[in-house]
């Protein structure tokens, strides 16, 4: 049996919220409730580094789903990855060595 468009939409929104919670600590609805004055969705207000991290997490989430990892486990793992990646992306680079 094929899923209906409504079911597909719900599944997609649910997976999007896994990424939202891992990255921002809240679902899209929670963010909208906290920011009723904002015109766009939470990702539209994300920084470039947050968007880079989200893109990476979307790819990793697909791999984790393919591996059969349960959603709760994926959420924890993605949150740990988001924290680590944001540390790297936000690093000012003062202690890095360059290839020059």
Question: Where do the language-model regions lie?
Answer:
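Positively charged, phosphate-engaging catalytic surfaces used for nucleic-acid and nucleotide handling
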Residues: 1-100
